[in-house]
Amino acid sequence: MPDPGTTARLLGITVLGDFILNEGIDPILDNLTGRAGATAVALNPTVTAPSEQGVGSFQPPIDAGSSPRLFERPLWGERALWVRGGPSYRANEDFYADTPYVPRRPNDLTDAHGALIGDFIDAALDRGLKVYFQVGAVQPSGLRDADRPRLPDGNLPQDRMADTGSLASAAIRAYNRAYVRDLLEHYPRITGFRPDWPEYPCYKLDEAFQDFGPQVQTWAENRGFDFNAIQQEMTAFYTYLHGSLQNRDLEDFAGADRGKLSQISLLRRYPAALEWLRLKASLSVDLLQHWRDSITQFGGPEKELSANAFMPPLTLFTGFDFAGAAAHCQAISPKFYTMHWSAMVEFWGRVLLERNPGLDEKLLVRSLAHLFDLGDDIAATGLDAYGYPEPDEPHPIPNAPQERKIAQVLALAQGRARITPLVHGYGPLDDFTRRFRLVARSPVDGVWINRYGYLSDTKLDAIGDIWRS
């Protein structure tokens, strides 16, 4: 088990290369340390430039077309825009000989701006900040369908929000090992890595039924899981949810008992479902062990592994196991992305309404809000009570369930890893400070904020006031 390290509380902020290019190294570090009081920063090894529509990626991320997000700090004078990117370094392609995935090719942006990332890392470290790379846990460039997760029937999930790969993919793991080696060769001073989604994201209902691909089958059977039995029952459960769900199935979930009896009844009806949840958890822990081994091999045991993850109870669906992960991670950052919790009610609900004619929307929305534990007194009568909040709209998640989730994570981790929740900066000032204050004043080991682009100077000052008080 890795040493969780110092007991000093950490305050980290994610700053992507776009903003370093726009605002400069010293002004950003002044904001992080002077205004906010940050002690850590995370970034990615990428540099960008504005591009024409449809070229590159749209920022902020559109989250499968659902997000109305806007930056509060402009990029090239805009609050939302298309950008193209390039790696900040020239990869050693020899490292990638064991994987079909090749590193990103350097381009004109690499030549013009790539050195800025290394300069920022050095400047941040010289100011006493910890510096991490935030990277995808299973997201190589040019992800192939052969390495994408599969539904119980073997098909690819449709309309995914997170284009992540199979946790069992040998090709992706070989790429990860090479990528870690490459980054540590170019940036040997970094503190560690923060892999995102070392699990199966469950934003959409289809995503919750990942992964039944052949690579998972091989991995599972080699470890004693009855993959065929799991696949057969989860196919039946998926079919049930997509055409046989009835109002009487929702009454217990929508009621005061929040579906406790119904969940046990479903496990009796589909007993292999529990094995499926155990399989995903084992696979997530195994992936994190691979990350830890790769980091130790090329950077030494002192380089930190700090994983980003969903929150309970959603981790039951994603497979992230806090106790298991703590055996390999110095820190874990469960995401307090409350705009996503709200959006998921609508994402799942629209599919269930469409596929199950006659469902009562009031029963459904309360059932989903209870299933995700989004409040103690759910009064919503329709899915439109949730959805993706607008930039000036408070997130509809009260304090109590957030405090409950913190307690659950701390209990699950058992003190074996630092718990540093990841709060999202998106949203109006009062609502953001409510959410940040709640986490900052809880008994966790620190807080991360994603990301700098959503943090106006007023928000940065508020962070500093709360953190120092």
Tell what function each PLM region has.
Residues 7-23, 83-125, 129-188, 202-229, ...:
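Active-site-adjacent "subsite" loops/lids of carbohydrate-active enzymes
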Residues 26-51, 71-89, 186-192, 329-333, ...:
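Catalytic domains of carbohydrate-active enzymes, especially glycoside hydrolases
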Residues 141-150, 201-205, 301-344, 427-444, ...:
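Substrate-binding cleft/loops of secretory-pathway carbohydrate-active enzymes
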Residues 14, 129-142, 194-198, 227-259, ...:
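Aromatic-lined carbohydrate-recognition surfaces of secreted/lumenal glycan-active proteins
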